[in-house]
């Protein structure tokens, strides 16, 4: 069937901020859909609240709304867009299948509330009936029964009484799955009545439709997924089979997964394939991709259907990257009427999309967790997803892919080789948790049988035998020295996936250049080097036109280097807190810009969720770990073509930055800011000296390499002090210490340090305003992109603070000083590309906190606010072009990039709901997973919109509970008065209430948790409180504070932990009380700015 000509405009709903359970994979799928539909000539409108995405770039859609993803805001966008359509235009369609669960839920809300009918909007990609049939647990169960497929025995529960009754019939354990939630939120396994009551209560609260599916436990069964596509002509193909290494009971997002499935016989696979095709047809997904999950009982082969996603999912992104088949792009084209046989495969340019992909390699995905960021969080894994990112690796065998995947995670952790107590290993094997794979390896290394490990873990014996072979190779290698190992044995170890670093560790090799370099040189001397194979969807049956490559130790190379001038861009690896999608955004922009400038762009990354690992983002994609060995091999392979080559390290965050000096030492041309300058900014003593020479103030500070030195220096500097390790991103292991005892505890427990990696100790500036500055520099000229004022005070990690552009109340003198210091620093550090500077302003004095001569996480946000693609310009500066080519007027006038008449507020999004035991207080260690942006012509409204987009809806009436620490109590009355003036009642604990009453404020007193009843937690649970302002007492949260903040999360009450954010909330609430808010299309804002501000013409940029 040809494309639909009856449609003229298509609205795509994005997935919003990065959260656990819904990550960068939806930027990848949304961006593909936008490009595909624009190329087909449709008018594309995008709604998404996340400024850090490629899909929200103004060129990806005709109009882009960075607005809160709520039914109210979407209705306003639909109203405006419908009104803009000329008479006689085609239909207005909504595509809800590329924005994850968020978009699907919103589409259902808009349909059920009548909004779609009101504005004559049609759904494409998935019809309402199909969405409901797949998402509603009861309808899905009935549909499976109709086609004769088995499902777990289950019941849909709306109250505690029915839940207990069902448990009496079926017995424990029971699996709980709340309806319409994300990443298994609220899910769990109940082993007894008490756990059932607790989990069921929480699950009912979290489900938007107040329902939870209780089902029989299939713990320990094998789990599989099939990724399918269907078109309007009822052609159905299976793109990829995926097998979970971990058995049922662990959320698939927290499980190691393998593609294609390894332990199914051909007959079993065909039965599962036929069942999946029956499912997609019965549910009624007319077009696009679907993911169907199965479980099989290893004892008797019983197969059951677990669930189906009638949309592009996390597994779709993995299947896309595993096969090279662009699922989201093809799903978008199917949604507008094409059939699979009418779409050509971009990779082969010969085969149609109805050819099922064939794999002649193995793909392994391993999740990345960060429980160390959340002390007190339960690290066991279950039906609720907890990982923050993932790495993917490709090899010719499972063993090779697994070993490459493990080193792609960059954990740097390994269990010691010496024996661990048997009872500890047993405990670690029985319960799924992030380090279980290491304990499995450890058990096998120390003689445990595969049968024993299988009985404890229920991991399939086939996988365990593979791990046993790795363990045996490990043990054998450890018994020899490097000189005793011949070329054949070394080649076998490399084929198994052992890295040079791992081999050097096993051989205890020592060398001045570094042990792994010694192994590298031994390999090369024996001619043992990787070759590069192509991911081509057809197992090399047809020629591939998109070089999507992976390394292996075989004979034939499929990726001869070209003779074009080229740039290698090092990506950021798996998403993690502190190094997320913002850095991938910068890598993509570098690839787009340099490709336009005639360079062959080469991307190196191992993250399957991202746009950077899409087959058409760069000219060549190496899906490889970001380690010295892997990058060096790629560089030498590409350089052998003889063409000019450069390597960019400053866009991918800390991961590639850590490689800058070793690469340069090996003769690799690192372009942009030199590795020496990067190192100078990171080296505390040398950087302090530079600031003194430039006459730029900094908080008093020093370094320490021992506990005694740390205590002496902290006492000398004066408390409070900020302590942190050197060379980290995301505020890893940072702490504000208010007394000597806290410094001692930090040095003993929190951090590893050495002569090379000292601990940094700075005086902490209390009641200071923090400011972030992003700028562009070519080594001579410098232009500031944005001076962002933090809404949280200094001491809260910059990634966890809301910030506003332009600044709200910084004086002209402070702004002038910031510009002067920024220009001085850019010149002194010889920055070529991007630089980020963090300042603290205390009583009008400007201090430098730190300088990062690289891309920062705020670059996408500043680019969206100003309309200037900073990362694209930075990439071009690194290849030798000058800033005057792009921003001549800004240089002449000394002007920052302009933001027009609007305020842009960026707010963080936190995973507190996934870690209910964790305190929500903010500090110098970053804990947010994503971000949103609010845009308005006044600060209050922009802040309110950002808070709403982040899931923290500010109330417009009701009662505010205020409890302030000793330092903040003096401001209690003034703050309370602002809320009283807005019509709120005030509740406070006795100490804060005294201050308020002294200031003439009427206040209701309430007990602290340990003082009596009813206390503040009782009021929260009784829905008496609409907002909480609770500033922490010190480094260690008091029992009362934690209880309050935890109760607030459960009740989903907005909670603010700093005075400055409370003041911003007052402005936000006032704006909401004034009435209707406005929505803005990014393209219109940028057009108005360029017309109204001649000082910002961006030359020569697409």
Swiss-Prot record:
UniProt-recorded Gene Ontology molecular function terms: ATP binding; carbamoyl-phosphate synthase (ammonia) activity; carbamoyl-phosphate synthase (glutamine-hydrolyzing) activity; metal ion binding
Keywords for this protein: Amino-acid biosynthesis, Arginine biosynthesis, ATP-binding, Ligase, Magnesium, Manganese, Metal-binding, Nucleotide-binding, Pyrimidine biosynthesis, Repeat
Positions of Mn(2+) 2 binding: 307, 309
Domain of life of the organism encoding this protein: Bacteria
Keyword tRNA processing: no
Residue segments, region Carbamoyl phosphate synthetic domain: 560-951
Binding-site positions, Mg(2+) 4: 850, 852
Residues annotated to bind Mg(2+) 1: 293, 307
Family: Belongs to the CarB family.
The name this protein goes by in its record: Carbamoyl phosphate synthase large chain
Pathway entry: Amino-acid biosynthesis; L-arginine biosynthesis; carbamoyl phosphate from bicarbonate: step 1/1; Pyrimidine metabolism; UMP biosynthesis via de novo pathway; (S)-dihydroorotate from bicarbonate: step 1/3
Comment, domains: The large subunit is composed of 2 ATP-grasp domains that are involved in binding the 2 ATP molecules needed for carbamoyl phosphate synthesis. The N-terminal ATP-grasp domain (referred to as the carboxyphosphate synthetic component) catalyzes the ATP-dependent phosphorylation of hydrogencarbonate to carboxyphosphate and the subsequent nucleophilic attack by ammonia to form a carbamate intermediate.
Binding positions for ATP 2 per the UniProt entry: 724, 763, 765, 770, 795-798, 838, 850
Subunit details: Composed of two chains; the small (or glutamine) chain promotes the hydrolysis of glutamine to ammonia, which is used by the large (or ammonia) chain to synthesize carbamoyl phosphate. Tetramer of heterodimers (alpha,beta)4.
Region (Carboxyphosphate synthetic domain): 1-410
The keyword Calcium is assigned to this record: no
Residue sites binding Mg(2+) 3 per the record: 838, 850
Cellular compartments per GO CC: cytoplasm
